[in-house]
Swiss-Prot record:
Residues involved in ATP binding: I23, R24, G65, K68, T69, T70, E131, D132, Y133, R174, Y184, R221
GO molecular function per UniProt: ATP binding; ATP hydrolysis activity; four-way junction DNA binding; four-way junction helicase activity
Segments for region (Small ATPAse domain (RuvB-S)): 185-255
Species this protein is from: Pasteurella multocida (strain Pm70)
Subcellular location: Cytoplasm
Highest taxon of the lineage: Bacteria
Domain statement: Has 3 domains, the large (RuvB-L) and small ATPase (RuvB-S) domains and the C-terminal head (RuvB-H) domain. The head domain binds DNA, while the ATPase domains jointly bind ATP, ADP or are empty depending on the state of the subunit in the translocation cycle. During a single DNA translocation step the structure of each domain remains the same, but their relative positions change.
Binding site for DNA: R294, R313, R318
Keywords, in A-Z order: ATP-binding, Cytoplasm, DNA damage, DNA recombination, DNA repair, DNA-binding, Hydrolase, Nucleotide-binding
Keyword RNA-binding: no
Protein name stated in the entry: Holliday junction branch migration complex subunit RuvB
Keyword hit for DNA damage: yes
Length: 335
């Protein structure tokens, strides 16, 4: 099984990016959660508008599915400017970036998703553009080549990344504002589910919103995906009404348990306990035991399990915690 196949995957699936636009908030006041980020951004935006300046360049980082793209669009909307969107892997040549920069209007937003995947050549073009609003372009080839400078209108670059540590220092230092998005509390996710249901004209109870929220692994993208699948279940079997009972039945059918775990999560934790006596177990042995690639364990399965206190990473290997034993209804063996 690969990450994209999981109902609780944090990656956007198929046309989800397009579907989610209908339920995305457009104003900071409608943005649920991340209170410190929202408070700071409201001040920064208001100050920039009072000075009639472009907003400082903004770096947004955090785990996938937490609303980095949504926040970028809100910033542009609040500033009353256009937003042009691209991603690091798409910008293969310096000319691709130059074309986008020269088409910006004053104070516009250029949003680059996965900015950590920019090539060094693209970064070199970005440095003077971000710092001096200038674009250095090479004209001609060989000995006849020469560099010319083009003035750019003041603009805001918003970069989004799940790996802030992978950004080069020169690029990271050019962002005047840096915001980290954290996993959401269940209460905030419950509000997000209720808001999304309202946007989709769904009949849903408060308790059903809560049942979906607490299985969403702190991630709005997962919450909205589960809501759509629960809606399908309710449309077919419960006349379109999403109650606590129908939500629980749908989530059981989807194999998402109360902790937000699916089959793969349980398989990994169970292997650590049953096959390796709770650990420590090396990553390669664990990967062989559950039939998955070690990269899948490191990048997909482990982060949430560690963050929730179900798995511990030690110098000697992975270990199950007391919480894991309680989850399976087992008693931890002591030597």
């Amino acid at each position: 099984m690969i990450e994209a196949d999981r109902i609780i995957s944090t990656s956007a699936k198929g046309d989800e990016e397009y579907i989610d636009r209908a339920i995305r908030p457009k104003l900071l006041n409608d943005y649920v959660g991340q209170p410190h980020v929202c408070e700071q951004m409201a001040i920064f935006i208001q100050a920039a508008k009072l000075r009639q300046d472009a907003l400082d360049h903004l770096l947004i980082f955090g785990p996938p599915g937490l609303g980095k793209t949504t926040l970028a669009n809100i910033v542009a909307h609040e500033m009353g400017v256009n937003i042009r969107t691209t991603s690091g892997p798409v910008l293969e040549k310096a000319g691709d970036l130059a074309a986008m920069l020269t088409n910006l209007e004053p104070h516009d937003v250029l949003f680059i998703d996965e900015i950590h995947r920019l090539s060094p050549a693209i970064e070199e073009v970005l440095y003077p553009a971000m710092e001096d609003y200038q674009l250095d372009i090479m004209i001609g080839e060989g000995p006849a080549a020469r560099s010319i400078k083009l003035d750019l209108p003041p603009f805001t670059l918003i970069g989004a990344t799940t790996r802030a540590g992978s950004l080069t220092s020169p690029l990271r230092d050019r962002f005047g504002i840096v915001q980290r998005l954290e996993f959401y509390a269940v209460e905030d996710l419950t509000s997000i589910v209720a808001r999304s249901a309202n946007c989709l004209n769904l009949s849903i109870s408060d308790t059903a919103c809560y049942e979906i929220a607490r299985r969403s692994r702190g991630t709005p993208r997962i919450a909205n995906r589960l809501l759509r699948r629960v809606r399908d279940f309710a449309d077919v079997r419960h006349a379109g009404i999403i109650s606590e009972e129908s939500a629980k039945a749908a989530l059981l059918m989807l194999d998402v348990d109360d902790a937000g775990f699916d089959y793969l999560d349980r398989k990994l934790l169970n292997a650590v306990i049953e096959r390796f006596d709770g650990g420590p177990v090396g990553l390669d042995n664990l990967a062989a035991a559950i039939g998955e690639e070690r990269e899948t364990i490191e990048d997909v399965l482990e982060p949430y399990l560690i963050q929730q206190g179900f798995l511990q990473r030690t110098p000697r290997g992975r270990m199950a915690t007391s919480r894991t034993y309680r989850y399976f209804g087992l008693e931890k063996l002591t030597e």
